[in-house]
């Protein structure tokens, strides 16, 4: 998976209205996305723990939070919004998957000036820990009501991604979880898996996308889960954002940049031994470059990259070396974790005149280029003309997204994984057997 830069995320979500609904984990998803739209840096621990603050990275607190009384009750409200010249991201804090308050939120989105282009939603932990022991009937009934209502009010062009709840730890000490539930953390872990199964099945039943975050993070609770057993650290949330953006790009028919993945915030998991093959070590976390880069994938049929990489320069005769530098494509080194006071935007903001309806809009990141000079002491014959290279990718016109491409669904426990059939290990017979008469 290629990790997108801030300039590429701005391009993918250009002129898009993104709505995120859910609990405190979803609030961290909102914060990391807002930060990634501006800087190539990670969240700090204090930003992850902050709740209901008046401002965060140039966003605003619209309603609730520190404007009123702060508490951990089921009636807590918090509405945040980040608005720039080309992006609008809004967050609604939910304590139940479907309620009268959620109905008011949906009516507000439906009657507002701007209609959402992307909705990211999850609600699980509050539903299974704060509404009594017999919560399953109401939770499943509310799921059915929710997706039925979303099917009615969302437009056909709006993409809804239901992400499953993240895994919880063996010991839960988060404040919103009641003390009597904290002593039964093992049962909460099982309930989260069961709730993810019901919610995923109901979302797919109504034709919505499902991103199984529980599947992706199931093996990383020991290192990236915080001590309260519920919330995750900054590396986990950046990896989550990249998974989410890759899913959105695929759903919108946008081809990701064809560059080698230079880092992974979280490894994919332990490798599997195969007969006759050596077990290779996985890349390290947070910016360690793999020893052997992966080959570039071939472009999918029917898709065109939003910002194609510059073409390779033509081959010249060996006896005519070039005296001028020739730009070549090179992979950018991974971004280290740095304090936000020292971070800077990775690119200039996109201008409105860069976008045209004749092209395809995508989140493909601009390629990073470096230069080297080929020096020669002799020159035979006239100097061949220098090729004209296209301008940098971030200065090219940006296409518009066309929907309708087939979507790729990553493997998860709730749907079959269509992989290539395994080769047979049976050997052919040494002697020809007589054919039956």
UniProtKB/Swiss-Prot annotation:
Instruction: Give the matching Gene3D superfamilies.
Output: SGNH hydrolase
The residue range of the signal peptide is: none
Which InterPro entries is this protein grouped with? SGNH_hydro_sf
Spell out the residue ranges making up region: Disordered. Answer: 401-437
**SUPFAM superfamilies this protein is in?**
SGNH hydrolase
Basic residues bias (residue ranges): 417-429
Question: Its domain of life?
Answer: Eukaryota
What family does this chain come from, according to its entry? Belongs to the PC-esterase family.
Q: Mind telling me what this protein is named?
A: PC-esterase domain-containing protein 1B
What gene name does this entry carry? PCED1B
